[in-house]
UniProtKB/Swiss-Prot annotation:
Official protein name in the record: Alkaline nuclease
Sites annotated Required for function: E229, D292, E317, K319
Subunit text: Interacts with major DNA-binding protein; this interaction increases the nuclease processivity of the alkaline exonuclease.
EC number: 3.1.-.-
Length: 565
């Protein structure tokens, strides 16, 4: 495992920063494009536009008529069209042929699904064939069944990747998107995989389990996470993600008007520029993952497209801990510990605050032992040892033990936030007693916890799309409190330092969100050399077993020419 520091070639458009100056920016390009669109709509002025102006507008996504669109809200009939039902209509290949890569069965399903949307009139005609890279998109014909064998003969690796990335761009609303929920059914995820002593394993009925899985539970803890995830994303953006001082040529509008970048303004709410949709494994089409936050450029169509100078992709999995939620106006152990933490701002007070509840978010385990699987953050540092420690004889397999060793020396950044400034309506990080804004603590991600497995699968899926980029995953833990009466209904802008001005006016704590108290940012190290191949092989094996079970109970191989539009 290569744990050497990451280096950049050239000046990347993004970088993770800590305590570096904030770079204010201006985004006037879209205003210029909008004015050009108005001019283009007037026939008398069309001929007066210079050719370079038209080219610039097209290059920046001004002509949105050609942009792919798939709806998030679907008719009831469409929501019942699952991958498994579509796959059950497929036929095995003749014995003389090799097995197809499962990705083509997945794309065949997506083509027919989008085709049904065409028939419903909720997407433009030709969208289904255009999504899969057809040079001359044709309208979908009712009754068509697309065969994977057809696609395997016509689609290149590049067109497969383009189709999968286009789907990601159309499902960035995640749980608020019915399309996202439908496409996840029949995909293996970290939660549907089983993890044995040697790594990932599949349930024999993995596809059925995924297809019939219930929706996301509507309990208070998950509601808290869904509400406050965008606050955590805004905090990460304000505290860590900085634009480079050097403007990159393809993002620069006019050297004479300063550094004007095209920022992704297509997200549903401000601060969600780095939100991701459903990414399917480009290697097999069996595994899916939805990242909470990926620092990466997007092209004018909204598709992920890292800049040529960006060699590293940073992504963040966000967890909001509802169990620390408290009312600051009520006397309680948590409120008292928080008041002391805000007053003294020491590592000792931090530990006391974390232990002010029954099951702290950071678990201590002895260096000669192994951690449990309950908490996502762990430590074996003696300074974090509680007065009473329950001795256990836990065991874990080589897979988890190896990852514990890889992450043992990692440390977390901990950010403490001051009380909101009601006059300026801002929230800023508070300096610790050491003078630092980010306190480094010997706390690392727990390989035995489901969050770690989730990040591992996300890294695997992302690496299939961007194999030449080094991945840097982080686990983000957000802790917030209830609002005081004087804070209710207010939206607070996030500053990156006490004496600084807001880095981005879109990075805010919305009125419906909790007031931030603490933010843990924990690097996650995965053994990609030992994991990627295992996941790929297990995925292919699981799919083939599912296919054999379906085909063995059905009719013999269809050796005739497939029927496809």
């Amino acid at each position: 495992m290569d744990s050497s520091p990451v280096t950049y070639s050239g000046e990347p458009p993004y970088k993770l920063r800590r305590l570096s100056p904030s770079y204010p920016y201006v985004s006037k390009l879209r205003e210029r494009c909008a004015s050009k669109i108005e001019t283009l709509s007037e026939g008398s002025a069309r001929d007066s536009l210079e050719e370079e102006d038209v080219s610039e507008a097209m290059a920046t996504g001004a002509f949105l008529a050609t942009r792919l669109y798939l709806p998030s809200v679907l008719p009831q009939r469409i929501t019942t069209l699952t991958f498994l039902d579509h796959f059950k209509k497929s036929r095995p290949l003749p014995n003389s042929d090799k097995r197809l890569n499962p990705i083509f069965y997945r794309l065949a399903y997506i083509r027919d699904l989008v085709g049904e949307m065409e028939l419903e009139g909720i997407v433009e005609r030709g969208t289904a064939s255009r999504l899969l890279g057809a040079s001359s998109p044709a309208g979908f014909v009712a009754g068509t069944y697309t065969h994977a064998r057809d696609l395997s003969k016509t689609m290149s690796l590049a067109s497969v990747r383009d189709a999968v990335l286009a789907i990601e761009a159309q499902t960035r609303d995640q749980s608020e998107s019915q399309l996202w929920a439908l496409l996840r059914r029949g995909l293996a995820t970290a939660s549907t995989m089983k993890w044995g002593a040697l790594g990932p394993q599949y349930h024999p009925q993995w596809c059925e389990v995924s297809t019939n899985a219930k929706g996301i539970p509507n309990n208070p803890a998950l509601q808290f996470g869904q509400t406050n995830e965008r606050t955590a994303r805004s905090l990460i953006s304000a505290l860590y993600v900085a634009r480079s001082e050097a403007a990159t040529p393809d993002l620069l509008v006019d050297p004479g008007c300063g550094q004007c970048f095209v920022f992704d303004e297509s997200a549903s709410v401000p601060g969600d520029a780095y939100a991701c949709g459903l990414l399917m494994d480009a290697r097999t089409g069996v595994v899916g993952a939805s990242l909470d936050m990926l620092v990466c450029d997007r092209d004018p169509s909204g598709v992920l497209s890292p800049h040529s100078t960006q060699t590293t992709l940073d992504f963040f999995e966000i967890k909001c801990r509802a169990k620390y939620l408290f009312d600051p106006d009520l006397f309680s152990p948590v409120a008292t510990a928080y008041a002391n933490l805000l007053k003294h701002r020491t590592a000792v007070c931090l530990r006391k605050f974390l232990r002010s509840i029954k099951n702290p978010a950071v678990e201590y385990f002895a260096p000669t032992s192994v951690p449990g699987a309950t908490e996502a953050l762990i430590t074996c540092n003696s300074s974090w040892k509680p007065r009473e420690v329950n001795e256990t004889n836990r065991r874990c397999g080589d897979f988890d033990r190896d990852h514990i060793a890889l992450n043992l020396d990692a440390s977390s950044d901990v950010w403490l936030f001051s009380e909101p400034d009601l006059e300026s309506e801002t929230i800023t990080p508070a300096r610790w007693d050491t003078g630092e804004l980010a306190l480094s603590v010997p706390v690392f991600a727990n390989p035995r916890h489901p969050n770690f497995k989730q990040i591992l699968v996300q890294a695997y899926v992302l690496s299939g799309h961007f194999p030449d980029h080094q991945l840097r995953p982080f686990l983000v833990t957000f802790i917030g409190r209830h609002r005081k009466r004087c804070e209710e209904g207010k939206t607070f802008t996030i500053c990156d330092r006490p004496e600084g001005s807001p880095y981005n006016l879109n990075e805010v704590v919305h009125s419906s969100c909790a007031i931030p108290i603490l933010l843990f940012v924990t690097p996650v190290i995965v053994d990609r050399e030992g994991c990627w191949e295992d996941i790929e092989i297990e995925s292919l094996t699981a799919f083939n077993k599912t296919a054999d079970a379906i085909w063995d109970s059905d009719s013999p191989a269809d050796v005739s020419e497939p029927t496809s539009s």
